Amino acid sequence: FKKRRPGVIVGRIIAGHGDTVAVRRGWLPAGAPILPDDPVFGDLAPAVLEDVLAGGRARLIGTGDRLTFIEPVLPLPRLIIAGAGHIGKAVARLASRLDFSVTVIDDRPEFANIRNVPEADEIILGEIGESVRRVEESPDNYFVIVTRGHQKDAEALRAAIGRDAAYVGMIGSKTKVELVHCEFLEAGWATAEEWDRVHAPIGVDIGSKSVEEIAVSIAAELVEVRAKRREPARP
């Protein structure tokens, strides 16, 4: 779980002789093989465990002399905020209350610290583009790029664009976004298809002006994207 892997926790109560019972429990990461002689998982159908994970709901199964409780463990989606300035701080504050695991990246010690962003689950002090590049790959990553300038934004975007992520968004006016768009395509840093997946200008258009309003618009877009990803696929 510390490695952000989804999986299931299984608890089993098995009737023995007389009034005795055996209690067994264990953790199984998603995709891990099940050995036939495993005392906890051995006789469980992999499809049952996969269904619990896919549905995100616990299941209680009673069969014969045993009772089995299967609980999914789904790590929170990871929000990576490039930039710990006023907007980055405000987004971190909101996202921490919206069931995101928040990582904040900045190259300035006076910003990349727990006093500045106390709501962050992880703070990375380092060169912004390289730090974004080193973020572990996951389809549940959400990248929000709100650094202090055009160059830093572009560096962070180069590291995030084209990755298997749920969301990549960059702050900026329509003029700035168009300049970055042209720069990326002309330099070969992104394909047109990759650029089309970038949310820029970032956030839901609510006419936001203040830092807090901008943060609300960004948080709303994050929640919207996450909700759409959770919708069951239509046949």
Locations of the language-model features?
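Short amphipathic alpha-helix with an adjacent loop that forms part of the alpha/beta core around
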Residues: 129-139
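Adenosine-phosphate binding glycine-rich loop
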Residues: 166, 170-235
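ADP-ribose/adenylate-binding Rossmann-like module
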Residues: 105, 142, 147-150, 158-184
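A short acidic, amphipathic alpha-helical/loop segment
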Residues: 94, 155-160
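Alpha-helical elements of the RecA-like P-loop NTPase motor core of helicases
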Residues: 89, 154, 178
